[in-house]
């Protein structure tokens, strides 16, 4: 391959990746929970309910690196991975940058739509986690991440 052909091939590769469409996982490594560890508590039993289950409250400081996608329009989704333990449900409020919502294990839900205008997408979620009483073990990791869908 000649130098000119290699330069053209490289330019096409860069151009095609800049126009990518589809779903990508976003870098949310700076997102963390406060406190880092939380103890699930038994929910009060309510007559007529089959299972009171367990719940916990946690604050999630969200910081998503969006530099690579600045200027692009699309939707950001929160994804709650499922695992081999009891199903988890999360419900949250926000400070306004992201959408409040509700999700169950194995699902994803919209938390932002529009053009990404900054290098990071920041917000704070106040999240209530709920699980049935069939949850076994003393610890469980809250496995969630964020995805960006582009048209």
Model-derived features: where do they sit?
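Bacterial N-terminal signal peptides that target proteins for export
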Residues: 1-7
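N-terminal signal peptide c-region/cleavage motif recognized by signal peptidases
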Residues: 14-18
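N-terminal small/polar-rich segments of proteins
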Residues: 19-85, 120-135, 139-141, 147-150
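Short flexible/disordered coil segments
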Residues: 94-98, 136, 143
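Extended, loop-rich substrate-binding clefts of extracytoplasmic carbohydrate-active enzymes
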Residues: 116
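Mid-chain, structured segments of secreted extracytoplasmic proteins
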Residues: 66-113
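Hydrophobic alpha-helical targeting segments used for export or membrane insertion
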Residues: 8-12
